[in-house]
Structures are given as structure tokens and as C-alpha cells.
């Protein structure tokens, strides 16, 4: 086999490894008709129909806590956190439990959509006014929906 072909194959393999390193899975969800995504590496589980215990003297967006197998987890309502009006809960509302740098937190969302593969090199800087929660955005290939990327590290620093 000529050396030129081997070099080409090696270059293609390196490019594939580089491209794979930039790809990440994201769990997408809707809140107030906005599509958000969170890196799947943070996701512990998705909970439906779990009772919340409210807490006094907390911001409105902290809906309360849950006891999940003996662990107390604070729950943040993303809708309220981004300044949207509160909504009635229905059967599609669920809690996504996240583990961010060893801290578990739950986010209350309108509905979970799907898992998508994202090329993180294609993420653009967020133009959203409340950048405390959004670190970037990307146009998805499934019809042009724009996904806002949730900045988990910033979110837990405020709880």
C-alpha cells in the first residue's frame, strides 16, 4: 500500500476522532414554547408526578424540594426562572434531575422532547437577554428549531 494512502487514512481517522470529540448528546425539553437543551452528561433521571414540598423564604422560581430515595433535591421552575408567567401543571410537566459537579438539582419543565446529537463547535453565543441560564444556541436539523443551551453551572450557583 502506498505511503500516501496510509497518510490519508491516518488523517481521516484523526479527523473522525476530532469530530467525535465535539459531538455531545443533549436532552431537549420545552418550557413556555421555548426549546431548551441540557448536556446529557448532567442528566440523572426524569421524574413524573412527584410531590413537591414548598419552602418558605425562597425565590418564586424555587418551587420546593423533593425527597428522592432519601436525598433532598431542590426544584427550580425554569419557566419562572426566565421570567415567564406561572402555568397550570398538567400530566406532561416533569422534573429533570441533574447532577452538576456533585450537586443534584431538579428542574421543572413543561415537557421533555428528545435526545439529540449536537456538534458543540456549531453552538453560537446566546443573544438572549437573560444569559444567566443560557450559554448558547443552535439550529437543529429537525426543521429549523432553535435550541437554547441551559448553563447548568450558572444555574446551581444561584440556588
Short names for language-model regions:
Residues 1-159:
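An acidic, low-aromatic, low-complexity terminal/linker signal
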Amino acid at each position: 500500500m502506498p505511503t500516501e494512502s496510509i497518510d490519508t487514512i491516518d488523517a481521516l481517522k484523526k479527523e473522525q476522532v476530532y469530530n467525535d470529540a465535539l459531538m455531545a448528546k443533549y436532552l431537549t425539553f420545552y418550557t413556555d414554547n421555548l426549546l431548551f437543551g441540557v448536556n446529557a452528561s448532567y442528566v440523572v433521571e426524569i421524574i413524573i408526578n412527584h410531590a413537591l414540598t414548598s419552602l418558605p423564604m425562597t425565590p418564586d422560581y424555587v418551587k420546593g424540594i423533593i425527597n428522592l430515595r432519601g436525598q433532598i433535591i431542590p426544584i427550580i421552575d425554569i419557566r419562572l426562572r426566565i421570567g415567564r408567567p406561572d402555568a397550570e401543571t398538567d400530566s406532561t410537566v416533569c422534573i429533570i434531575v441533574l447532577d452538576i459537579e456533585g450537586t443534584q438539582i431538579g428542574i421543572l419543565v413543561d415537557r421533555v422532547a428528545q435526545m439529540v446529537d449536537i456538534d458543540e463547535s456549531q453552538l453560537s453565543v446566546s443573544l438572549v437577554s437573560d444569559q444567566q441560564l443560557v450559554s448558547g444556541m443552535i439550529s437543529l436539523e429537525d426543521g429549523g428549531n432553535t435550541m437554547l443551551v441551559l448553563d447548568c453551572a450558572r444555574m446551581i450557583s444561584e440556588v
